[in-house]
Amino acid sequence: MPLSDAPLGHNVAYPSEYNAALLFPIARAENRAGLGLDGALPFDGTDIWNAYELSWLDAKGKPRIAMASFRIPASSPNIIESKSFKLYLNSFNQTRLPNAQTLRDLLEKDLSAAAGAPVDMDFILPQRFDTLRIQELSGINLDKLDVEVDRYEPAPELLGCTGTGIIEETLMSRLLKSNCPVTGQPDWASVQIAYRGRPIDRAGLLKYIISFRQHAEFHEHCVERIFCDLMQACQPEQLTVYARYTRRGGLDINPWRSNAGASAPADLRGARQ
């Protein structure tokens, strides 16, 4: 289905009952073709979604609440358009279910069908809420650098290396901003870049991250673009790119891409999330 058919950017009625057909998948292939990724992917990855506004009715009609974390593999053929995801979750608000496990089973089944691959989830009931914590991304903070910036569309030519030796380091910035390709709404994120290879020029990397400021692309696509541009410019032996975007409509999206053979990171919310 074309993106113009998605609920994003349109006025739509909020559903009054459960409806899995509300989920709107978007193929990853078109964006990846634009990055030259038409064969085996150069990374592993996961899109970590967090749902903060999840509610349903129990068998007696009493509201129940929970939070949930979903992990959609980057190898899946589809992403799920975020407004359709929100509408789908809201369709449970007036739906009676016998127990929380029934809801969990429906979520896993429906989201896996939309993504085209198994979706893992962590179902967080209120008794676990006080175990959740906030933790900022680790790494050397690039935002302290004094740089002059005049590029606000992705400029991979800003990327480069400063030496020939091999190092391992982790860098981070809170200055990633992109925009929804349909509505133009700003998407705010912190991004972490861990690599093994020649030293990446830090000032150039910060200016490159800032250059996304007027760019219109979905969260997942931005992270894959950053990964591919860094691989092309610096050819690190290992590279991991992880972004944590602020929430919208009760959902946040946190794409992670890596060729380091590591497991996906723990889902630790940042202060702005």
From Swiss-Prot:
Substrate binds at residues 80-82, 219-220. SUPFAM superfamilies: Tetrahydrobiopterin biosynthesis enzymes-like. It comes from the Bacteria. It is found in: Cytoplasm. The active site is at 180 (thioimide intermediate), 187 (proton donor). Pathway: tRNA modification; tRNA-queuosine biosynthesis. One of its GO terms (cellular component) is cytoplasm. The keyword Nucleotidyltransferase does not apply. NADPH binds at residues 82-83, 248-249. Its EC number is 1.7.1.13. Its main location: cytoplasm. It catalyses: 7-aminomethyl-7-carbaguanine + 2 NADP(+) = 7-cyano-7-deazaguanine + 2 NADPH + 3 H(+). GO terms for biological process: queuosine biosynthetic process; tRNA modification. Transmembrane segments: none annotated. Keywords: Cytoplasm, NADP, Oxidoreductase, Queuosine biosynthesis. GO terms for molecular function: preQ1 synthase activity. The keyword Acyltransferase does not apply. Belongs to the GTP cyclohydrolase I family. QueF type 2 subfamily. NCBIfam families: QueF. Homodimer. Catalyzes the NADPH-dependent reduction of 7-cyano-7-deazaguanine (preQ0) to 7-aminomethyl-7-deazaguanine (preQ1). This is NADPH-dependent 7-cyano-7-deazaguanine reductase. The lineage of its organism: Bacteria, Pseudomonadati, Pseudomonadota, Betaproteobacteria, Burkholderiales. The gene is queF.
